[in-house]
């Protein structure tokens, strides 16, 4: 057993070392808050001096949002078998409204805990979970509605601003006006604004009290657009060590949250390893695991099995649950004439259960019971779109919009319990129908954050659906979607590997950033301006480092111009030394400046008179 456990830990440690090197040209910094234990991580990109030819000025570092946790900090020693430091434990405990349990509440969790066959894969550094005291509500929404600004709220306010107040270069602050479609975009994010947005339900701060390792992050259309990356093992592919690696890899490249969609062996144990080593919010779809417990027979599912699964996962520290409570019995026939029917796994499970029993969805009928569980651990609802369109032909149909209306009804119930709630959206939608989705969601769901899978704007590009969906994601992000669920090149084809995860995240970081630019989010253009200046001044290393993927940028440049001298060249391999448009522009500027100098000298030689008599 010890040998097996050691092998797993060693494998995970080796994997972590391959993905934890510092991001080129950057260093981890921590911006202090109002208390010593509130240190907000960011990434500072150092820039070189502008060459003398272009004025010879210093270029201040650029601060950017960072999701990578301690993994990219060379000063931190990573031990995956111990997990990350419990950053928020003191904040949770000092509120005095939770208690440490004497044992696990879930019967399934207790069975796994005492099964010796699982010793080889069990996370070794486990601690007992916390739960709200009797009668208490421990959600960030509950605190916000009572006028309390929590350390988590201050943390995200500092994080969202990205040290914008420290920028002194007016050129970097230059920005086109945005079109926010009614959003309340602020010039500076304050803790009070964060509190107010959470209290209104327009933003969520997913932070389970049993995930103290997480660095607080906010999701809402008045904040930076966030992205989610999916990972998870299946019955036929992928193991625990690989999933931990994918977690670290996903957050390295910019995943704001990660959903563990495991459906295969050791779901419970895999999730524990992931949560204990995750600085970002973790989401799940509990119905997947509940289905495993009944050997994949949807009709055998019961409320009791599902309830036990919710408690099991809440006590592990899952931050948000996708719950398909809007798939109602009366909506199922509306999908019969669709081209692709019901494509959501969770949606199809609940539809099958409804038809098998000819009863209403038990997630819907027990929704208030679910709320009681959510508010005892501060788990955020992600109300699932189980009837989302699976092709553009099915977009915006009666089934999809009927479910959306029900999700609006459920949102109001969740808010009655002060449970944080976001709404999941499509799917496959052609570009001309995207805004209708956003407008209807805002109207039906009271501006609760929208969380969309793309949408994919065409169905003809298997192998390239990270592109087809990033197009729709950029658009719907501009219109108001708060978080975008990434799509990888393997969508519809297979389980993504590490490179697929990277490609999907990059496509979605581009989409999210484009949306922030279009909305006019303050400071969104700073990085663009800094990179453009570096590009014009042929500061190649700065160009690489300011990019979303510095390693890829350098790799592509060095394929054709690999020598160190080429990092100082005033051209690239695209146009060569004689046809570089930026070099030509600089030559024109120099010519114009020299011409102006000659005219100035002639003016002074003529007596410096404005007018001359003929």
Swiss-Prot record:
Record key words, sorted: 4Fe-4S, Iron, Iron-sulfur, Lyase, Metal-binding, S-adenosyl-L-methionine, Thiamine biosynthesis, Zinc
Pfam families: ThiC-associated, ThiC_Rad_SAM
Residues noted as binding substrate in the record, renumbered to the chain: 230, 259, 288, 324, 344-346, 385-388, 424, 451
Record field: catalytic activity: 5-amino-1-(5-phospho-beta-D-ribosyl)imidazole + S-adenosyl-L-methionine = 4-amino-2-methyl-5-(phosphooxymethyl)pyrimidine + CO + 5'-deoxyadenosine + formate + L-methionine + 3 H(+)
Binding site for [4Fe-4S] cluster: 572, 575, 580
Pathway: Cofactor biosynthesis; thiamine diphosphate biosynthesis
GO cellular component entries: cytosol
Positions annotated to bind Zn(2+): 428, 492
EC number(s) recorded for this UniProt protein: 4.1.99.17
Domain of life: Bacteria
Annotated region described as Disordered, given as residue ranges: 1-36
Single Gene Ontology MF annotation: 4 iron, 4 sulfur cluster binding
Cofactor: [4Fe-4S] cluster
A biological-process GO annotation: thiamine diphosphate biosynthetic process
Annotated cofactor note: Binds 1 [4Fe-4S] cluster per subunit. The cluster is coordinated with 3 cysteines and an exchangeable S-adenosyl-L-methionine.
Composition bias, Low complexity: 1-16
Family: Belongs to the ThiC family.
HAMAP family, A to Z: ThiC
Free-text function comment from the UniProt entry: Catalyzes the synthesis of the hydroxymethylpyrimidine phosphate (HMP-P) moiety of thiamine from aminoimidazole ribotide (AIR) in a radical S-adenosyl-L-methionine (SAM)-dependent reaction.
Summary of subunit composition and partner proteins: Homodimer.
Name the record gives this protein: Phosphomethylpyrimidine synthase
Protein species of origin: Stenotrophomonas maltophilia (strain R551-3)
Gene symbol of the encoding locus: thiC
């Amino acid at each position: 057993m010890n040998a097996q456990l050691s092998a797993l830990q060693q494998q995970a440690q080796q994997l972590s070392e391959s993905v934890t090197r510092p991001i080129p040209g950057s260093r981890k910094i921590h911006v202090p808050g109002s208390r010593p234990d509130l240190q907000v991580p960011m990434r500072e990109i150092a820039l070189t001096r502008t060459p003398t030819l272009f004025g010879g000025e210093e270029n201040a570092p650029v601060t950017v949002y960072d999701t990578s946790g301690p993994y990219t900090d060379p000063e931190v020693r990573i031990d995956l078998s111990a997990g990350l430091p419990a950053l928020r434990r003191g904040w949770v405990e000092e509120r005095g409204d939770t208690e440490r349990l004497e044992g696990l509440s879930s019967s399934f969790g207790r069975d796994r805990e005492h099964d010796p066959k699982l010793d080889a894969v069990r996370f070794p550094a486990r601690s007992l979970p916390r739960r709200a005291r009797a009668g208490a509500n421990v959600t960030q929404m509950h605190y916000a509605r009572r006028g309390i600004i929590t350390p988590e709220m201050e943390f995200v306010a500092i994080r969202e601003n990205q040290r914008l107040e420290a920028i002194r270069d007016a050129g970097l602050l230059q920005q086109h006006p945005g079109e926010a479609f009614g959003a309340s975009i602020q010039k500076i994010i304050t803790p009070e604004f964060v509190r107010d947005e959470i209290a209104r339900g327009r933003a969520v701060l997913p932070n389970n009290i049993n995930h103290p390792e997480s660095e607080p992050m906010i999701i809402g259309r008045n904040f930076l657009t966030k992205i989610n990356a999916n990972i998870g093992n299946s019955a036929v592919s992928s193991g625990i060590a690989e999933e931990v690696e994918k977690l670290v890899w996903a957050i390295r490249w910019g995943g704001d949250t990660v959903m563990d969609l495991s459906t295969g062996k050791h779901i419970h144990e895999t999730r524990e390893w992931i949560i204990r080593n995750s600085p970002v919010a973790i989401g799940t779809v509990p119905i997947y695991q509940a289905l495993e417990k009944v050997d994949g027979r949807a009709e055998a599912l019961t409320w009791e099995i599902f309830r036990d699964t919710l408690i099991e996962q809440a006590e592990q520290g899952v931050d948000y649950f996708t719950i398909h409570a809007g798939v109602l019995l009366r909506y199922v026939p509306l999908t019969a004439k669709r081209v692709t029917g019901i494509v959501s796994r969770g949606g199809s499970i609940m539809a099958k259960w409804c038809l098998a029993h000819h009863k209403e969805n038990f997630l819907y009928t027990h929704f208030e019971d679910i709320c009681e569980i959510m508010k005892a651990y501060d788990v955020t609802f992600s109300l699932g779109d189980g009837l989302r369109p699976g092709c553009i032909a099915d977009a915006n149909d009666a089934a999809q919009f009927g479910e959306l209306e029900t999700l609006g009804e459920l949102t109001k119930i969740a808010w009655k319990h002060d449970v944080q709630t976001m709404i999941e959206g499509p799917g496959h939608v052609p570009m001309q129908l995207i805004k209708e989705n956003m407008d209807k969601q805002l109207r039906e769901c009271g501006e609760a954050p929208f969380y969309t899978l793309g949408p994919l704007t065409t169905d003809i590009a298997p192998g390239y659906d990270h592109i087809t969906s990033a197009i729709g994601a950029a658009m719907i992000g501009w219109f108001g979607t708060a978080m975008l669920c990434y799509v990888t090149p393997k969508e519809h084809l297979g389980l993504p590997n590490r490179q697929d995860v990277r490609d999907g995240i990059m496509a979605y970081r581009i989409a999210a950033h484009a949306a922030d630019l279009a909305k006019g989010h303050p400071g969104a253009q700073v990085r663009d301006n800094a990179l453009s200046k570096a590009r014009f001044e042929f500061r190649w290393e700065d160009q690489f480092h300011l990019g979303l993927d510095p390693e890829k940028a350098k790799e592509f440049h060095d394929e054709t111009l690999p020598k160190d001298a080429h990092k100082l060249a005033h051209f690239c391999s695209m146009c060569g030394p004689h046809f570089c448009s930026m070099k030509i522009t600089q030559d024109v500027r120099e010519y114009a400046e020299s011409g102006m100098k000659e005219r100035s000298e002639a003016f002074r030689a003529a007596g410096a008179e404005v007018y001359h008599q003929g």
